[in-house]
C-alpha cells in the first residue's frame, strides 16, 4: 500500500510491534502486557495524527490509490447488481457505472462515477472524467428509475468533467446543465454520496438529490486545490493554502448547508478498512430510504427545491450593515 507522508511514523511503529511479536514467539523478549502497552501507544499516536490533519492531507487521503471506488462499493454492498450501459445517443461512457442493485432486499438504481484502480483501468475509465455521454447515461438510468418507482443512489468520485475538445463538441456544458434541470424535478427519491473527489461540474451533474452526504475525508468543491492555486497565485505548489481556503470538506460544507450528512471513516481513511465503510454507507442508504419513502411526491419535490434554493442564501443584521 502506498504511504502518505503523515502515515510513515504510524507504519514504522506498527512494524516495530510486529517484529517484537515475531521475536517473542522464540525468545519472549517482552511480556504480553508490555506488547499491549505498545499497542495502546500506537492507538494514541494514530488518534493524535489523524485528529489533526490539514485540509491538504485529507485531500491526499481522498486521492489514495487504494481508496475504494464505486465498483468496490457495488461489490461490497449489493446482493445483486445488473449493469446497464450506453446513453442511447452516442456511446457508453466507462467513467460511469450504473445499474439495478439490491441492498438488503431493497431495490435501487445505483449510479457511480468510476476512476479505475490501476493504469489500464484508469485509462479505460478516463480517470473518472465524464464525457457528455456519461451524463446522458446517468440521466437515462435515473429516468428509468423514475418510471419503475426505484430510489436512486449516486456515488460521486471525479476530478471533474472531461475538458477535451471532443467533449465540448458533443455538448459537455449542456449535458451537465440538463442533468441539473432534469434531476431537480425527478419524481423519485435521490440519495447522493460523495465517496472521493467531488470536483466542479463533473460532480454537480450527478449530485442533485434529496439528501447529500460525504465521507469524512472526501471533498466537494468548485475546483481542485491545484487549479485554485494556479488561478489565485499562479503557483500550483500553493495547493495546501488553497485546500484550506476552499472549505471543501464535510464539516465546513455541512455548516453551509451544502451537505446534510458526514459519514465517519476508519482511522486513517476508507482504504484502511473498506468493509467497515461499506457497512456504514449501506446503513446510511437504507436509513435515508426509510425516511424519504414516506414523503409524497409533492413534498419530496418541494423539499428538494427548497434545499437547493436556499444554498448560498445568508441573512445579515441590519445593524451590521452600512447606514442609510
From Swiss-Prot:
Q: What is its EC number?
A: 2.1.3.15
Residue stretches making up the CoA carboxyltransferase C-terminal domain? 37-291
Any one Gene Ontology molecular-function term assigned to this protein's record: ATP binding
Which region is the signal sequence? none
Q: Which GO terms describe its biological process?
A: fatty acid biosynthetic process; malonyl-CoA biosynthetic process
Report which superkingdom the organism of origin falls in: Bacteria
Q: Which UniProt keywords apply?
A: ATP-binding, Cytoplasm, Fatty acid biosynthesis, Fatty acid metabolism, Lipid biosynthesis, Lipid metabolism, Nucleotide-binding, Transferase
Pathway(s) of this molecule? Lipid metabolism; malonyl-CoA biosynthesis; malonyl-CoA from acetyl-CoA: step 1/1
Q: What does this protein do?
A: Component of the acetyl coenzyme A carboxylase (ACC) complex. First, biotin carboxylase catalyzes the carboxylation of biotin on its carrier protein (BCCP) and then the CO(2) group is transferred by the carboxyltransferase to acetyl-CoA to form malonyl-CoA.
Record-given protein name:
Acetyl-coenzyme A carboxylase carboxyl transferase subunit alpha
Species annotation:
Chlamydia caviae (strain ATCC VR-813 / DSM 19441 / 03DC25 / GPIC)
The protein's gene is named accA
